[in-house]
Amino acid sequence: MARPIVAIIGRPNVGKSTLVNRLCRSREAIVDDKPGVTRDRTYQDGFWGDREFKVVDTGGLVFDDDSEFLPEIREQANLALAEASVALVIVDGQQGVTAADESIAEWLRTQPCPTLVAVNKCESPDQGLAMAAEFWRLGLGEPFPISAIHGAGTGDLLDRVLSLLPPKHEEPEEDEPIQMAIIGRPNVGKSSLLNAICGEPRAIVSPIRGTTRDTIDTRLEREGHPWRLIDTAGIRRRRSVNYGPEFFGINRSFKAIERSDVCVLVIDALDGVTEQDQRLAGRIEDDGRACVLVVNKWDAVEKDSHTMPMVEKELRAKLYFLDWATMLFTSALTGQRVESIFALASLAVEQHRRRVSTSVVNEVLKEALSWRSPPTSRGGRQGRLYYGTQVASRPPSFTLFVNDPKLFGDTYRRYVERQLREGLGFDGTPLKLFWRGKQQRAAERELARQQNRLG
C-alpha cells in the first residue's frame, strides 16, 4: 500500500519549503527569500511517531496573475491535491490574512481533501495565538500557530495531520528503488521526458530556460521493480549563474548525480554536443555512474536512412570518454522510443553492479596479452602483467598486478580496458582499473604483517 500524501499549499514566500524541510528533516527543498522559488511539485519522505507519509511541496499559488508559468504552477497544485489525504495551507502570521489567502481558501473549500491551516512565522508563543486567531475567518477550521524555522508548534500540527490520515496497514518492505537522474543543459527536454515517462505532467514544461529549479523525485514501477526518477535543474556554466535559487538548484543537480545509480544525459539533437554537455559527461564518469545518452528532439531533425548513424558518430566523437554508454534517439513530444529508456537504464544498472570471477578475468587478460604484448621501455625493460581480479562493483573495478605500473602507458592501458569490455561486456558502465607493482604489493604485505602482530 502506498504511503499517504500530505500536500503543502500556499501563496509564494510564506515558508512552504522551510516547513517541508522541517517535516522531512532534510534540506532538499530550495529555500530563498525571493517569492516563487519552488515551481514544480516535489516529493519527500516524512514521518511522525510511528507513521510514515509523503510530503508534496507545490509552487506558490497566485490566482490573479497569469504571467510566465503561474498557470502551470496552479495545475501542479491541483494534481498534488487530487492525490493527497490531507492538505496543509500555509499562511504568513506576520502579514495577516491577504486577498491571496482568501482566494486559496475559497478554492480549497470546494475540494474534498481535508484541510488544515498552518500559520507560519509565529516565533513568539504569546503573540502566535493572537496572530493565528485572525485566520479563523478563512473558514477552514482551527488555525495552528507554528514556526517552520524553529519548529515551534509543528508537533501539535503533525498530531492533527496523523488523525486525518487513513488507518495504518501492515505494509511489506519495499525493494530499494533504482535511482535514475535525468540531467542536461537547460531546455533540452528533461522535464518533457519525465512527463512522457510518467504519463502525467510531473514537471512544468516551458520554453523559458531554467524552468525546473528543484530536483523532482518521482517514484514509479517498471516490470515489478521500483524506480526513483530525479529530474534536475538545467546545468549551465558556473559563471553564467547568479548565487540565488538557480545556483542551489545546480548544486542539487550535482548531488543528484552522486546519489544516482544511473544517469540519463539528455542532449539536444538540434544543438549537438556543447562544451557544457562534455563537462556533464565528465562528471558522470568521475563519479563512476552508469549512463544512457538520450538524444532528444529527434522529431525536429530532417533525416534519411543515413542520418542517425552519421549523427551518432559525430556525437560520440565529442563524447569519446563515454564511448561505453548506449545512445538512444528520442522525442519526448511524440513519445518516440521513450519507453526504451527504462530497458537501457536497467541493463546499465545490471552491468554497473555485476561481478566477474577472477578466473574469467584472467582468461580475457591472457588473450589480450597474446594479441598485443606490453610495451618495452627505452632502457629495455618490458612490462609484465601477471594477473588481475575484480575488487569492487558500482562501478566495476579491477586491480591488475604488474612488475612496474610506469611501464604501462595510457595507450596500452586503454587497450586493456577495451579488451576487458569486449570479453566481459559491461555496456553502460564505466570501468576503473588500478595498476599495482611489486614494491607496492610488498609494502602492503608488510603493513598487513605489522597489523597482525599488533592484533
UniProtKB/Swiss-Prot annotation:
The KH-like domain is annotated at 354-439
Disulfide connectivity for this sequence is none
Residues that hold GTP 1 according to the record: 10-17, 57-61, 120-123
Report keywords, A-Z.
GTP-binding, Nucleotide-binding, Repeat, Ribosome biogenesis
Q: Which domain of life is it from?
A: Bacteria
What Pfam families would the database entry show?
KH_dom-like (PF14714), MMR_HSR1 (PF01926)
Q: Which family does it belong to?
A: Belongs to the TRAFAC class TrmE-Era-EngA-EngB-Septin-like GTPase superfamily. EngA (Der) GTPase family.
Q: HAMAP family from the xrefs?
A: GTPase_Der
This one is known as GTPase Der
Q: Which gene encodes it?
A: der
